[in-house]
Amino acid sequence: MQHPTLQPEVDPNPVVSSSSSSSSSNPLPAHLNPANYPQTRYFSDSNIHLELTYNPLDPTKSLAQIRSPHAGANVLFLGTTRSTFDNRPVARLTYTSYAPLALRTLEKIARGAVTKYQLCGISISHRLGEVRVAEESIAIAVAAGHRRPAWRAGEEVLEECKAAVEIWKREEFIGAGAGEGEGEWRANRDTDSQGNCRGDKVAEG
């Protein structure tokens, strides 16, 4: 039985698997199969919109979701793939997630922000799969009565997403003696707000 406030949104451009023959012989786990995405959650009681998708993110949609006549400030944050990490040229990032847990964690973060900052709405979208340089991996939009709580909520939600949400990324590098495709898996929490590493890295050649 579906929770009365839990209303899945329908994406107009769903991702369709392109290799049905290979997937039938060696099926991917459900949470790693792009054909099972986007996965979205909408909680009408707090105007919360959550999304995990393999499609490019749509900042205009994120802002439209949170607009409210009671909001005096709308803040949008876009996290993009930068061209270097630790002075090494980056080819791309690849994100993976365990969606059932990740969506529950995102809901907890969003509800906490709504309560703490009296938000009129919040939208959190995270892209999965390959995200190339200058493309967006996360979009966070918040609406509040005034600019100060909107700014603070946006930053706090971002930091909590990086610290707690069950999403992992692989950084693939080029040049500097490394062939394209060399990379490292790490949790989002492994880098701080300045892009510096925290803790040990898990290397993959």
From Swiss-Prot:
One of its GO terms (cellular component) is molybdopterin synthase complex. It comes from the Eukaryota. Residues 183-205 have a biased composition (Basic and acidic residues). Pathway: Cofactor biosynthesis; molybdopterin biosynthesis. GO terms for molecular function: molybdopterin synthase activity. Keywords: Cytoplasm, Molybdenum cofactor biosynthesis, Transferase. One of its GO terms (biological process) is Mo-molybdopterin cofactor biosynthetic process. Disulfide bonds: none annotated. Substrate binds at H146, R147, K162, K169, R170, E171. Its EC number is 2.8.1.12. Residues 1-36, 179-205 are annotated as: Disordered. It catalyses: 2 [molybdopterin-synthase sulfur-carrier protein]-C-terminal-Gly-aminoethanethioate + cyclic pyranopterin phosphate + H2O = molybdopterin + 2 [molybdopterin-synthase sulfur-carrier protein]-C-terminal Gly-Gly + 2 H(+). The keyword Transferase applies. HAMAP family: MOC2B. Belongs to the MoaE family. MOCS2B subfamily. Heterotetramer; composed of 2 small (MOCS2A) and 2 large (MOCS2B) subunits. Catalytic subunit of the molybdopterin synthase complex, a complex that catalyzes the conversion of precursor Z into molybdopterin. Acts by mediating the incorporation of 2 sulfur atoms from thiocarboxylated MOCS2A into precursor Z to generate a dithiolene group. This is Molybdopterin synthase catalytic subunit.
